Amino acid sequence: MSQDDEIVMRDVTSAGICIGDRIGREAASQLDLEEALEASRYASHPYSTHPREWPPLIEVGETWELPSVLIERYNTAGGEGTALCGIFPEIRRAWASVDNSLFLWRFDKRDGQCPEYSGEEQAICAVGLAKCRPGVFVEAIQYLLVLATPVELVLVGVCCTEGPDGRDPYAEISVQPLPDYTISSDGVTMTCVTCTNKGRIFMAGRDGHIYELLYTTGSGWNKRCRKVCLTAGVGSMISRWVVPNVFKFGAVDPVVEMVVDNERQILYARTEEMKLQAYVSGPNGEGPLKKVAEERNLLNQKDLSQGNRQSAVAGRSNKPSIVSISPLSMLESKWLHLVAALSDGRRMYLSTSSSGSGSTISFSGFNNHRQTPNCLKVVSTRPSPPLGVGVGLGFGAASVAGRTQNDDLSMKIETAYYSVGTLVLSDSSPPAMSSLLVVSRDSSVHSQAGSSSGPSSRSSRALREVVSSLPIEGRMLFVADVLPSPDTAATIQSLYSELEYCGVEVSGESYEKACGKLWARSDLSTQHILPRRKIVVFTTMGMMELVFNRPVDILRRLLESNSPRSLLEDFFTRFGVGEAAAMCLMLAARIINFEDLISNIVADKAAEAFEDPRIVGMPQFDGSSGLSNTRTATGGFSMGQVVQEAEPIFSGAHEGLCLCTSRLLFPLWELPVMSKKTSSDTMSEDGVVICRLSTSAMHVLESKIRSLEKFLRSRRNQRRGLYGCVAGLGDVTGSILYGTGSELGATERNMVRNLFGAYSNGGESANKRQRLPYSPAELAATEVRAMECIRQLLLRSAEALFLLQLLSQHHVARLVQELDANLKQALVQLTFHQLVCSEEGDQIATRLISAVMEYYTGSDGRGTVDDISPRLREGCPSYFKESDYKFYLAVERLERAALTSDAEEKENVAREAFSFLSKVPGSADLQTVCKRFEDLRFYEAVVCLPLQKAQALDPAGDAFNDQLDASIREHALAQRKQCYEIIANALRSLASPLASPTLDEASRSQYICQIVHLGVQSTDRAFREYLYKAMIELHLENELLEYGGPDLVPFLQNAGSHSESQVGAVSTGSSPLGHSGTQISSDQAKYFDLLAKYYVSKRQHVLAAHVFLRLAERRAISLGDSPTLERRRDDLSQAVLQAKNASNSDGLVGSAQGVSDSGLLDLLEGKLAVLQFQIKIRDKLEAIASNFESSVAMQDSDQNGQVLDGDSSDDTNLANAANEMAMEVSSELKSVTQLYNEYAVPFELWEICLEMLYFANYSGDADSSIIRETWARLIDQALSQGGIREACAVLKRVGSHIYPGDGVVLPLDVLCLHLERAALERSERIENVRDEDIAKALLAACKGAAEPVLNAYDRLLSNAAVVPSPNLRIRLLRSVLVVLREWAMSVLSDRMGSSPTRSSLILGGSFALENKAALNQGARDKIANAANRYMTEVRRLALPPNKTDGVYAGFKELDESLLSPFSF
């Protein structure tokens, strides 16, 4: 598509708004016939004359003589037999009967055929044609002839056969006798037969009753055909059975005419006495016939007769009578239902509803105005057309002038025919020759309709008709419309069937008959699609075809005949400049259907008239608009109001183009392009999606629209008309013609206002003086700009129709099968306006084209892209662009690659597809395409194509421009991320074995590495970050650390930190202690953890230690996001390990020195120790809470619902407090001071307190109260919980942990005395305390060192004030004996390399003397001296022998063993 023909959607949208408004006004301008008749009551001239200088409005097309065989038969009968005639337009046949013979012949062309049917013996008295009900006869029988004789009713089948070319379905007919479908008339002579569009047959008898003829296939005893009387009561039926009709002498008023309103399901009947009856047959036309109204005095309702009885009798011969009745279609009127033509030329319009009107026509809701018939009343009377006004062929005036003075100048109508707005009267008032008066709607007055109110508006809405008079030979017998051809009818039906404004509702009627109703509308709005109307008149002398010239036909004749310019100007004046220009445009573009082709001369003259400023005018400003806007409602001037700017009035050429375009698009614009077809035999409730319009209808409309667009383009290229006027404006031309400028308004509505006739100069509204914003040249350029927008709209509309035809040819139902439910619903609701003008319509069209391409490029091989793409590129290039062509070529290559087994060829074909797509990255459907590349394992395209599309979507890099608004940046980044997600999905597929079960691990790793390599090489910073996040999410940390780019560390730092300053502390290697305790979420922790692993892998141990420390000390953002203490311990342990590795590493310059200087290792180890205390405190608190809760539960079960005592309540409170403290201590790291003061001491965790005091290197006097009190509380706590054994166990556990100490943390004197006293007290009561328990516990606390324990006992025994009690002293001496023995055994075991247990056996066994030499002499002396000293001390005690002898003997035995001659 060249630049000149390129469609700018902004222009299309602007023109679409303008044309949409025009279409809305077109629909609103259509008046109901009742409103037009009401307005015409106040008009002085309801009839107009056709200009004599113009070509005739109605002309005789052809005349035919009656078939010779018919004339011969009639002459043979001597002119006295029974003869009837009529026309069956449904089968294109005229008919006539002579006695018992029926003749049928073609009335619209001469084919020489006139078949005769004479199967009856009696004369035919009534004839009718009915549609054949389905399922009764064979398919070949389409219609039934209904023949009534005085004695029988006969059905005859009619078979229609199409011609050789297949275009004429009624080329030949044959009649098929049906002998089983003949019944007796029961002596009733039928006067007329009428049939409904659903095949029901009604007959009127001379007895005044209405009958229905029913027929079925027949089964069993049932008759195949029967006659039912619908209007007679029970009494009348019995009377008929008993007394034959010939013996009834009462007055009978037979029905002479019946007509059916198939839209409202009403049957009207007219009797000889001018009585009208109305019957209804149910809402669907299949119910029983029911009389709803009967009116005898219709002529009196409108004062048709005046005066007394005598004058009425005297003037009885002049009283008008009803000549004919005809139903009015709903297209003509919703409130008027029947028109009756009178013998004096007047018309009565009747309604069957008692309610009034008062509604307007709209696009929808047409059926809502149907009301149940309940009466027959005259609503309006139309005066008779004046004699002599019709000048169709110039005979009317002459016929009036030829009458004598005594002749009655009133009309004498013999027969009348009314159909869709046209009335044909046979006037026998002329003395010499009868004439036909044809009354039709005058189209010219519609161009004068205004929007103002008052008398002028009423006059513009009044019904005006033009009268034409034609002479005829003989009498008019029957008139019928010549229906459009089947092809034309099918096209019109498809276009207008769902447009209720036009009322083309088939409802069982043939397309031809239903579409003929459009003639009721103005010729101006339908002449572009409807052919010339034709009627055929059956007279006693032959047949005559009358052709109605449309306004465009008259204009064509004027242009063909080289008429004076004044006639052309008169034509423009009569129809209005806009309407006349529209007709010129139709002729110039050749979009009107004619029987013959439009000559080039006529087309050129029409184009010249369309562009002639002397005829269509020039665009100008409304000089009175600014002034008129200053007037107030009262008619004066308001000095306080701002004078509005003058509005431009475009030329008639622009107005004509708008009218022509809106009428072409009218049946499409606001209606959906698709519909759902449902059938009873399908189980689906959704139905099948099909194109609403037929392919032939869309083709017809497309050709018309393309012809119009082609004409406008040629005038632009040739610089004709206004195009030539604006050609000299230089650079302004480009912006005017192609929309590249920015001066046309900020929004679409403003642009439409500027382009299509509502100007505002903006910014200067304070100036109250009227001003002209544009020069005449600029104003002309603006009109050209507006016309160019409409041209682009036409081109886009033609392309949309072409696309719809293509979709229909490929079966839309099949194409939409794969669409999701939401897209299907959007497609069904999509209007043509949206398809042409909206982005949504463009997207849906793209999706449908994609479905067509998938049909061709599918694996089953229906074709290639080049099989269908040329049609798309030529027919709808704005929907199928060059980029789309390359895209589908790539898709075709992908399909071929998928079917190729050779690996090298597969890769080459895939690379070809990648090459195509790389040229059009912005138009590719990446979701589908990249998935196909994934299946081919061609991951280069999977990575590169989304990155190219991301760049195409955001070429300026708005996502990274901090100078732009945040919403713009976010939108650009969101578009990029949609592309990135495709690459991430490919990674997910590879990372999940379930998604790719056939892929081995080696290949999986290879492809993942390939994607990562390609991604890291990208210059798109946002994508690399997105890739890193996706890899972390997929647990591809190892691959990320191995192949990550140089920006991986900054990415991890930024992702884990809240600010750049925090990242700087870590990245530079400095200690991040100033940031300890920073709030970090679990997601951020992932990045820090990965950063630490990265540092470890790169042997940057100091940085890794800092990151692990930061992870251990982090504070949670939310309560549930807090890491456990065990996790913190793991992180700190890792930090200690990395610090140790750094101190042992010689590879990093300055690392060991940095650790030595900062004491990082000591710091980390100290933090780890404090964390261990914290974990212990938490566990203790949880245990305390659990114990208290168990205690409370046991008390509750024991008390069985009694009120809790105070202790139970305290336990509950303690349990709650312990739980709260446990949760608090688990939330974050605490200092050793906090742990000691806030948790350990309040909950009496004395053991942990001692450990923390030892860890803190607590120093003080030996009598330090804190140490002593803590130990005392710990021992008391143990004693209360488990007695001496528990206290000894605690002493062993705690003492061994903190020994060796400086005597402050482990005060042996205090512990010894405290335990010995407790043991003495408890042994005297209930507890069994062994002598060695305390001594061995003290020895264990000192890690087996006996001397410190012995020294403690020495100090106690030497101070009588401290240990005054003999019992306590003997208790201490027993413990001393245990200490000395243990000391001796430990010395022996050290020398012999045996355990202390075995040493005790040796020392007291048979080998004691032999092994004593192994004892250390120094230790032996100390032990011996102590034993001698304590033996003396035992003797000094004032205690009974039974308490001292054993102790004394022990010391003595020990001493003797040490003093043996075999001593070492």
Curated annotation (Swiss-Prot):
Subcellular location: Nucleus, Nuclear pore complex
Keyword Membrane belongs to the record: no
GO term, biological process aspect, one: nucleocytoplasmic transport
GO CC, any one term: plasmodesma
Major place of residence: nucleus
PANTHER family: NUCLEAR PORE COMPLEX PROTEIN NUP155
Name of protein: Nuclear pore complex protein NUP155
Gene from which this protein is expressed: NUP155
